[in-house]
């Protein structure tokens, strides 16, 4: 709860002027005259954070913004003006005005930060328009949408990147470095997920984004206006990529390995109902609703190379934040909860090491190079790195670290978990979104210091 509130406080700087640390500007790989022209589709709280970080770069220009909420556009314009940036073209004339933004010749790339149901169609439209697309998580809601992303990328040759920031968390990248250097031995098992009390996010009073009230949908504001309906209507892991994205990078999913099958189970749904009764009373209309999403959803994924991944979705109950990472191989393991590592032959037998000394030893080159300047970018610095990877990839018009095949495979967990739960935990096969090419695709080089 505190991490989200701290993020909101930083994002709201946009409404009161931009606090820019002196001397911090980013952008290096292309000539300064070759600025990447970016259109922002969605400048709510998440999109505004991306905008705040883009303003700090000297290699990009914001040429257009689009949001159906005129107030969000005004805040974005104010931030750009106070930073001495040119005024972009504004699009706010209905839900499909973003397509007019995509028609602009002075837009090379777009960043999509909108409600989930718009992610695939906007990303698809962007690729069809020849715009390099960055989309927030998750990228798709159905298997058909997953294929839409892959097919559109292949048919147009235009790239897209799923903007999964946790792949760039400092401890996650250090552990990735350990995996690639074979510290854990041959990898066998992983645990991850999204465990975060979002009751105060999914329900509010229609005036305050977080922390008050029992409304959602038409009577809600911010995320409660759209996110909570997924909990009402879908019994699925609707937000898997924060956990699965980093694990996929560690075991080269879609690049020599792939997800093969998934089984999922859900508990009963009580958390949101009890929260509504607590803050809105037993007679509140929303207290009469039956939410479909189980409070805790647990999925087990098998890979073609023989690893298993347990993924947990737990957002409707009182609990501290945790992504629940566990990374295990034949020589040892790391567990984030407890901040502990055990490496056979290095650790004392049957005793955990504190993780800090290992994470410092294997600190990732990216964090060694950019860590100090990335700290204020949002979410502990992760947002700087994921945005930097997007910008640098788009400037060169090359495949990003997390591409259309990754977006499809990771996002497919949602509909496949839903099907498995509906069928009493029956295993569901993952489509091969690479059409067999995962066998010969080379692993992405994550151990470098540029992006």
What does each model-identified segment do?
Residues 15, 49, 248, 318-451:
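C-terminal helical cap and adjacent loop that interface with cofactors, partners, or active-site loops
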Residues 299-305, 329:
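Active-site beta-strand termini and strand-to-loop segments that position acidic
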Residues 1-135, 147, 151-159, 450:
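N-terminal glycine-/serine-/threonine-rich beta1-alpha1-beta2 phosphate-ribose binding loop
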């Amino acid at each position: 709860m505190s991490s989200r509130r701290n993020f909101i406080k930083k994002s709201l700087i946009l409404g009161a002027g931009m606090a820019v640390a002196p001397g911090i500007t980013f952008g290096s790989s292309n000539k300064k005259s070759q600025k990447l022209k970016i259109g922002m589709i969605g400048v709510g709280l998440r999109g505004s954070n991306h905008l705040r970080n883009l303003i700090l770069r000297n290699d990009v220009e914001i040429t257009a913004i689009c949001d159906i909420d005129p107030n969000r556009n005004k805040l974005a314009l104010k931030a750009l003006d106070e930073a001495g940036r040119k005024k972009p073209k504004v699009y706010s004339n209905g839900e499909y005005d973003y397509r007019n933004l995509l028609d602009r010749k002075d837009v090379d790339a777009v960043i999509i930060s909108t409600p989930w149901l718009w992610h695939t169609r906007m990303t698809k439209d962007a690729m069809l328009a020849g715009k390099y697309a960055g989309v927030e998580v998750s990228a798709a809601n159905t298997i058909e949408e997953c294929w839409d992303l892959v097919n559109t990328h292949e048919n147009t040759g235009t790239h897209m990147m799923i903007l999964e920031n946790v792949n760039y968390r400092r401890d996650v990248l250090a552990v990735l470095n350990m995996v690639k250097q074979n510290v854990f031995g041959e990898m066998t098992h992983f645990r991850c997920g999204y465990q975060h009390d979002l009751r105060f996010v999914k329900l509010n009073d229609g005036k305050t984004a977080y922390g008050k009230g029992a409304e959602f949908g038409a009577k809600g504001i911010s995320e409660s206006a759209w996110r909570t309906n997924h909990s009402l209507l879908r019994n699925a892991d609707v937000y898997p990529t924060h956990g699965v994205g980093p694990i996929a990078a560690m075991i080269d999913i879609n690049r020599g390995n792939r997800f093969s099958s998934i089984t999922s189970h859900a508990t009963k749904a009580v958390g949101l109902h009890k929260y509504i009764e607590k803050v809105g009373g037993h007679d509140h209309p929303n207290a009469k609703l039956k939410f479909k999403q189980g409070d805790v959803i647990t999925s087990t994924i098998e890979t073609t190379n023989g690893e298993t991944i347990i993924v947990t979705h737990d957002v409707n109950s009182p609990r501290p934040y945790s992504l629940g990472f566990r990374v295990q191989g034949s020589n040892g393991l790391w567990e984030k909860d407890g901040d502990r590592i055990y490496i056979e032959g290095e650790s004392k037998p049957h005793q955990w090491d504190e993780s800090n000394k290992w994470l410092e030893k294997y600190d990732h080159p990216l964090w060694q190079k950019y860590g100090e300047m990335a700290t204020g970018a949002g979410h502990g610095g992760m947002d700087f790195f994921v945005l930097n990877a997007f910008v640098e990839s788009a400037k060169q018009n090359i495949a990003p670290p997390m591409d259309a095949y990754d977006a499809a495979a990771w996002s497919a967990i949602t509909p496949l978990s839903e099907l498995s739960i509906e069928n009493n935990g029956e295993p569901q096969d993952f489509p091969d979104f690479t059409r067999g090419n995962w066998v010969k695709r080379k692993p992405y080089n994550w151990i470098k210091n540029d992006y």
